[in-house]
Amino acid sequence: MPNPERHGGKKDGSGGASGTLQPSSGGGSSNSRERHRLVSKHKRHKSKHSKDMGLVTPEAAPLGTIIKPLVEYDDISSDSDTFSDDMAFKLDRRENDERRGTDRSDRLHKHRHHQHRRSRDLLKTKQTEKEKNQEVSSKSGSMKDRISGSSKRSNEENEDYGKAQISKSSSNKESRSSKLHKEKTRKERELKSGHKDRSKSHRKRETPKSYKTVDSPKRRSRSPHRKWSDSPKQDDSPSGASYGQDYDLSPPRSHTSSNYDSYKKSPGSTSRRQSISPPYKEPSAYQSSTRSPSPYSRRQRSVSPYSRRRSSSYERSGSYSGRSPSPYGRRRSSSPFMSKRSLSRSPLPSRKSMKSRSRSPAYSRHSSSHSKKKRSGSRSRHSSISPVRLPLNSSLGAELSRKKKERAAAAAAAKMDGKESKGSPIFLPRKENSLVEAKDSGLESKKLTRGVKLEKSAPDTELVNIPHLNTEVKNSLDTGKVKLDENSEKHPIKDLKAQGSRDSKPIALKEEIVTPKETETSEKETPPPVPAVTSPPPPLPTTSPPPQTPPLPPLPPLPAIPQQPPLPPPQPAFSHVLASSTSTLPPSTHPRTSTLSSQANSQPLAQVSVKTQVSVTAAIPHLKTSTLPPLPLPPLLPGDDDMDSPKETPPSKPVKKEKEQRPRHLLTDLPLPPELPGGDPSPPDSPEPKAVTPPQQPYKKRPKICCPRYGERRQTESDWGKRCVDKFDIIGIIGEGTYGQVYKAKDKDTGELVALKKVRLDNEKEGFPITAIREIKILRQLIHRSVVNMKEIVTDKQDALDFKKDKGAFYLVFEYMDHDLMGLLESGLVHFSEDHIKSFMKQLMEGLDYCHKKNFLHRDIKCSNILLNNSGQIKLADFGLARLYNSEESRPYTNKVITLWYRPPELLLGEERYTPAIDVWSCGCILGELFTKKPIFQANLELAQLELISRLCGSPCPAVWPDVIKLPYFNTMKPKKQYRRRLREEFSFIPSAALDLLDHMLTLDPSKRCTAEQTLQSDFLKDVELSKMDPPDLPHWQDCHELWSKKRRRQRQSGVVIEEPPPSKASRKETTSGTSAEPVKNSSPAPPQPASGKVEPGTGDAIGLGDITQQLNQSELAVLLNLLQSQTDLSIPQMAQLLNIHSNPEMQQQLEALNQSISALTEATSQQQDSEHMAPEESLKEAPPALVVQPSAEQTTSEASSTPADMQNMLAVLLSQLMKTQEPAGSLEENNSDKNSGPQGPRRTPTMPQEEAAACPPHILPPEKRPPEPPGPPPPPPPPPLIEGDLSSAPQELNPAVTAALLQLLSQPEAEPPGHLPHEHQALRPMEYSTRPHPNRTYGNTDGPETGFSATDTDERNSGPALTESLTQTLVKNRTFSGSVSHLGESSSYQGTGSVQFPGDQDLRFARVPLPLHSVVGQPFLKAEGSSNSVVHAETKLQNYGELGPGTTGASSSGAGLNWGGSAQSSAYGKLYRGPTRVPPRGGRGRGVPY
């Protein structure tokens, strides 16, 4: 039967353990009795060694029973118990060290040669005990049967090991076995009688069998497996495994803490543990386990208090498992623990001690969790679990560093031990369990089983057992062959694994961040235990143990044991056990990791913990029983860990120990988690691990807040948290983070620029902000050229004592980056070429791919979190929302992450089990934004955001996204109508390779969306060579950050001209805006292209005016709105009449020419002229807006080509006329026109300037209009007086800044217009999007037209549908929507992002749009004619209503207003206008639209 086979594999360990554990089955009682007799013989031999190990009193049994429940709770609360457990572990380790000292030589030789004999003696003793136990209950009988099978095998293995081991184990174990067995039989009878009836008892019985199998060499190799797949391996008792798990997990905690304390407190408790190991012969069992059988005795027991502690732990756990008085005893260890106990007791007293350890709360926890994990298939999980365990036990940083050091030490020690022990004993000797290893197959398997039992039964036992388990695991790892030989050994190892997994689970909780590293460590460890991996599967144990058995002979090398003694007795034992479990665990664990994600986390911890875990487990179980005492252990733990690490071949094990030890340190040092790579801060025992002792420094300097990042050893010179913020000269504030401000500062020592991110603590209820902790832990693990580098942490206190006065603040010190992408796009100071966009995206996706491969989700990718320096280097920043991602884990995450504009549809629909695809969607939004200069999806509500996404990417439906129906909000957030995917049409203006990538990144179905790695292989990015890319021409005189951009936008809105910072910025925007404003008015009429063209000048005006309009009073805005509304009735002839153009046939011709020019894509100039025309029209009541629109388009063309003077004149005329029409609005316009008119001279009728401008550039307009324009807008005969009055009022109302901005706009557009025209033609192709790009983002618009264009863009996108009037209405809606967006900080131009804004979206803003505006939209022609200024004013008003906030929004609003006039035009114009807008980029000061 598989269990007996495993038992046989365990021979030594399983025989004794089975005697104790098997009592449950009646059939097995005879076999178990026979084996018990054998065990007793072995125990007699071992008793000599066992006596040295420590005397275990029968009391241990009762304690064990008490401890069992404790063990369960310990599993649950291993985190909190980690620290208190250390004390108990120290004691155990000391005992173990003592035992090691006495038993090292014996164990080494006996371990290899006499382990079989020992196991036989132990088996005999345990069989005797088993018989007694069987008498107690049928459960005990069944367990004994399992034990007997294991004892038989263990006897065989013992023979292989050597008679020396047998003699030791038998002598010691017999004495202990007799006592313990008697007590155990009594307890087991009591407990098992209750358990027998339950199915749990059967499961446990089966579990004991599996444990027995594991106890032997098999167990060792398997014990890692066993931890997770005890029951699976024990095919006989899946339920048994689950029982062990269940019990381990809950009750043992409470019991563990109390029992563990008692163990710690009294030597009697240690003796109890010992007695527990053998059923009731604790002394013999303890001695044997201490000397040879238990990895503890070899590795950590040598003379370490561990041996005593563990013996007490064994006693408790033995009493627990034997008597099973407590429900935990029944569930967990009645049958499984009994088998474990009997196995470990009868084969080797040392295993008993291990058992007691396993019984100890921590240990039992481990065993139960392991068995559960085994059941679930935690083999794959194991690797994950061990890393997780480490984090749970201690602070992530400390444990990680410790683990690293210990791993290194373990690797070195493993080599040394391997040489000494010929490979197999390497691990055991390291853990001072080499003697135990000699008895290893039988004793260790028994111990492991016992350890598992004890873990379940009592935390204290767990502590003791963990060392044994670790040693066994290490033995199995070191002696992969030995493990194969000894199936029983593997099973014990598995038990250890189970225990380790329990420990690791809590650790995992603690050190979530450390988990990745720990997982790596566990993976590293996993390779050494490959033989164990073979043995881990339930069937494998039988098969694989034989291969491992041959290595057992090498186990004897005594030198390994001597190494162990240096380890601090308490911690070494524990760490050794952990190490063993880790070593064994890795093979099985890795397979299990996939199966059990959470368990996998714990198991990797166990593996990593193998070194650290010993301390961790010791710390955890002890913590459970007595939290305070274990705290002192951490210092010892490091040494022990180091010792363990040298003994343990797998370097990851030492890391675990380091982690275990460091946990306490970690409590003091938050940043320590990244230290994981560093190694144990205090590894005195392991000089080799010390080699990796950056953590040592933290130990030396405990006040350290942060340890250097793994790759930053050099920076250890100035320890994190050691410096004060006064070492920096703060230059200014550059941002506002989630938990404080961000400052630009200069290091006084080095002179380098840094960014200081302030973490304020005064308002923190929880102490240090969790987001800051998470960011620190994650950033210390991410070292990449495209990820921002955190240099150190400083405080605002000179002395640590100052924190008593007030909490103060911490500062995270980052490398300084000159700009962020949002600030640059919104500034309008930069125009990115296709190559620049390629470079940015390549760097961004490389950084994201790195994060995803490290299993981190960023969860907040947006333009303001993408930093650039002046050399064009991009870095991903702000990891405050980032978190570790486990693909095997099914736990939900919050979906309230990622800024709304960049949030993917699955999060909007309520997905909580998302993948890294969420970050790819955000990067796709940024790719579109780089081309369009504005966010492509700008909504202020989740429903509106989903609507925008649906309009561009199609509605989410099962046809394209099969799993969408499973999402919580799929039915509640369905769009009002179904949309088809229009992304390729909307973005047809971008290169095809970029379009393909954008299409793939913005796929609705996250499972079909490309990964970050795939984006790097796309045609757009695969051939990009960053080294050959020319850096973009970034503004070196101005750092463009989000905060600066927002301030600038607010100033623009408030009317304060921000020309000074970069005058070029203001002038560019203004110029462009002026141009766009006029075209917008034109666009309002029928021709969409002219609308766009007009939008550009109008927007420019709006922006030039934009600043003015921002400055306009509400009354002025209202006047503008009224004018625009009244203009709806205007026709082209009416407009001409109003403008006095009707009298001139040339004007009519010009109007026709304007229409042609509109067709010719001369939107920019025509828009400007139109706005001029509109001004006169407005003064004339804007009756002929339609006419004006066409002429203005024509004029716009001419104006674009016309000289800057013409542009200025036209703008001035438009402004003056607008002012005339409405004195409030007119006053603003007057101011502009005055400034413009100064150069222009007389303000002729706007018609004249328009005609001139149109005629000059296109040469279509009659020269009449053109000449008046350059000198100044000649006032039309009727309008001039009005214009003058308006102008006079306007200058008064307008700020000088506004006038200056207008002038700049005029001058700049002049230069820009020619370029605009060609661009316009190009833009025509993309139409909506092309228009959109310029106005796309307020900050995105490089040129003024774009700024003004944002509103237009919105309109144009609507016009994309090509509905002129509906477009105008939608434009109004968009406008309103954009206004609301600007509230959000988006620019209306942002909203303008053409296709993004749809009627539904507009509805949101629509409410905000004044009715007049709507009417204006209804009357696009009037608007167009109504003078761009009035339109701009009206739009500005709208945006103000919408609280566009940014001045750019106002400007863009005006531009949009024009667009409203001609939505249909807007689409045509959009294309036209788009080109010019791009040229205007310099002027495209982003129209100050709110981001």
UniProtKB/Swiss-Prot annotation:
By what name is this protein known? Cyclin-dependent kinase 12
User: What happens to this protein after translation, modification-wise?
Assistant: Phosphorylation at Thr-894 increases kinase activity.
Active site, renumbered? D860 (proton acceptor)
Q: Please give the superkingdom of this protein's source.
A: Eukaryota
Residues annotated as domain Protein kinase: 728-1021
The taxonomy runs: Eukaryota, Metazoa, Chordata, Craniata, Vertebrata
GO MF, one term, reads: ATP binding
EC number(s): the record gives 2.7.11.22, 2.7.11.23
PANTHER family in the record, alphabetically? CELL DIVISION PROTEIN KINASE (PTHR24056), CYCLIN-DEPENDENT KINASE 12 (PTHR24056:SF126)
Keywords, in A-Z order: ATP-binding, Isopeptide bond, Kinase, mRNA processing, mRNA splicing, Nucleotide-binding, Nucleus, Phosphoprotein, Serine/threonine-protein kinase, Transferase, Ubl conjugation
**Which residues are annotated with the PTM Phosphotyrosine?**
Y73
Give the UniProt family note: Belongs to the protein kinase superfamily. CMGC Ser/Thr protein kinase family. CDC2/CDKX subfamily.
Crosslink feature (Glycyl lysine isopeptide (Lys-Gly) (interchain with G-Cter in SUMO2)) location: K264, K510, K656
Keyword Ubl conjugation on this protein?
A: yes
Location of Phosphoserine modifications: 237, 250, 266, 275, 277, 302, 304, 311, 313, 319, 324, 326, 333-335, 339, 342, 344, 346, 384, 386, 401, 421, 424, 615, 645, 682, 686, 890, 1054, 1084
Picking any one GO biological process from the record gives: positive regulation of transcription elongation by RNA polymerase II
Q: Where in the cell is it found?
A: Nucleus; Nucleus speckle
- Residues that coordinate or bind ATP: 734-742, 757, 815-820, 1041
Q: Where is the composition biased (Low complexity)?
A: 288-306, 314-351, 578-598, 1191-1204, 1474-1491
Carries keyword Metal-binding? no
Quaternary organization: Interacts with CCNL1 and CCNL2.
Question: What are the boundaries of the signal sequence?
Answer: none
Cellular component per GO?
cyclin K-CDK12 complex; cyclin/CDK positive transcription elongation factor complex; nuclear cyclin-dependent protein kinase holoenzyme complex; nuclear speck
Listed Acidic residues bias regions:
72-84
Native organism is: Ailuropoda melanoleuca (Giant panda)
